[in-house]
Amino acid sequence: MSTLLSILSVICSQAIAKAFPNLEDWAPEITPSTKEHFGHYQCNDAMKLARVLKKAPRAIAEAIVAELPQEPFSLIEIAGAGFINFTFSPVFLNQQLEHFKDALKLGFQVSQPKKIIIDFSSPNIAKDMHVGHLRSTIIGDSLARIFSYVGHDVLRLNHIGDWGTAFGMLITYLQENPCDYSDLEDLTSLYKKAYVCFTNDEEFKKRSQQNVVALQAKDPQAIAIWEKICETSEKAFQKIYDILDIVVEKRGESFYNPFLPEIIEDLEKKGLLTVSNDAKCVFHEAFSIPFMVQKSDGGYNYATTDLAAMRYRIEEDHADKIIIVTDLGQSLHFQLLEATAIAAGYLQPGIFSHVGFGLVLDPQGKKLKTRSGENVKLRELLDTAIEKAEEALREHRPELTDEAIQERAPVIGINAIKYSDLSSHRTSDYVFSFEKMLRFEGNTAMFLLYAYVRIQGIKRRLGISQLSLEGPPEIQEPAEELLALTLLRFPEALESTIKELCPHFLTDYLYNLTHKFNGFFRDSHIQDSPYAKSRLFLCALAEQVLATGMHLLGLKTLERL
């Protein structure tokens, strides 16, 4: 389905070409109107063309308008110096709603589906997932859902940190201090003890380094301990993924170990390596620091692994696009990785995107930590969110049974955390506040969920299980027109999210849609109205778009609150 924006862009492009035939390939810039009295969309190109054509903007606007067709508009007007405002006719909006109804079922499929790899979450073995993993996990999951929805083939990868010198240290400690480590909390505690030994005891450090060599040589005893450590950690990670409703395929750093020597050999053959302080590096003119791919002791590092992963994803997974979701602090590393992969011929420009994100802050504007200064454990944060949701339900809905509260609280709590994160621009830091994220008003998950529940209430009052999408609709009132227009902008929100890799475009859209639905609900009565069928059609579309949009954000719906 063509979006309203794309339809209008074609119409304006043709009008500009007719008005100014000597102007080559001018792409008009169309934007939604900032205020309702300016119509539905606005074209500001007359101001830009004034510099090119050496004419007054208003005269240019008048020339463009003279070439515009009457259909599908009810009003075209020139405002101010030369802004062209467009208002679509109710007949056209009704027709588009019929097309939209069908396209919504299919997912607004792209014409050329691609293989997309999204690398997200990526916790480290033997360590608790913390609040920093929250952003990577839910941003990556939302992007994966959206790319899949529009028809792309998405491979979700979890690049778990399951290799390196830290494992030699932990294996040594467990060999010398046998104990139970079937729980991640035990393992995390043991990791801290092992680190103290590694830091303060030179002999322990030597034995740890020997165990790294043993692990790389696939010594049976070292491998057995390593596998048990990984198994314990992954079970704990999966519990969190189950709570968050995350599906992701594990492919840890260790997967790429067999390819690391070949990477170094290939870079040497291509003349890309320079020895610096006994380490092998790739230097780039655009960067002040090199990309080190082999340490001075001959060992590999995460840069080597990331380069091998990039090559594998292109050559073996046949990815058309690779997206890695991590904090912004790793931006330079990924810029160097991309530059090196391009120089080595593994990657073409424009295929890789690093989706960086900002910090999660406490109410004082500092990085969210525990009182002891440690990272907040993600599992504890999620459990607290559910507890807070239970408290809110008991306060506002005292008539609910314990069973009803236990059913609804996890949905409300997890929705609140996800939406609070996704509604913030991903590159910005945001303040984590349970009090704000659980509000019924404002840009919150509860605000969206309440509108969805309202629609379920309409169905119960009418004694029906499903709203009819039998058309055609008949737009009569301003509130209906605003709701229809907003519904039709759903694919535009998806396009913006995909283009910028920022889920907040979708949250902003759903927040706006909820506002428009609430206005419609207030002003457009359904029962005993001659327009009941048409208004129920709009309710049905609003229900589907809200449910779909929330699903794409990883949120769940409820029939009742």
From Swiss-Prot:
Question: Top-level EC class, please?
Answer: ligase
Keyword Transcription on this protein?
no
| Taxonomic superkingdom | Bacteria
Q: Which SMART domains match?
A: Arg_tRNA_synt_N (SM01016), DALR_1 (SM00836)
Query: Motif 'HIGH' region: where?
Result: 123-133
Q: Name one GO cellular component term.
A: cytoplasm
GO annotation terms (biological process): arginyl-tRNA aminoacylation
One annotated GO molecular function = ATP binding
Instruction: Give a yes or no for keyword ATP-binding in this entry.
Output: yes
Please tell me where this protein is predominantly located: cytoplasm
Q: Which Pfam families match?
A: Arg_tRNA_synt_N (PF03485), DALR_1 (PF05746), tRNA-synt_1d (PF00750)
User: Where found?
Assistant: Cytoplasm
The record, for Gene3D superfamilies, names: Arginyl tRNA synthetase N-terminal domain (3.30.1360.70), HUPs (3.40.50.620), Isoleucyl-tRNA Synthetase, Domain 1 (1.10.730.10)
Question: Which terms are listed as keywords in the entry?
Answer: Aminoacyl-tRNA synthetase, ATP-binding, Cytoplasm, Ligase, Nucleotide-binding, Protein biosynthesis
Q: Which reaction does it catalyse?
A: tRNA(Arg) + L-arginine + ATP = L-arginyl-tRNA(Arg) + AMP + diphosphate
- Could you tell me the EC number(s) of this protein? 6.1.1.19
Similarity comment text for this entry: Belongs to the class-I aminoacyl-tRNA synthetase family.
Its subunit composition reads: Monomer.
Protein's name in the database: Arginine--tRNA ligase
The species this protein was found in: Chlamydia pneumoniae (Chlamydophila pneumoniae)
**Could you read off the lineage of the organism from its UniProt record?**
Bacteria, Pseudomonadati, Chlamydiota, Chlamydiia, Chlamydiales
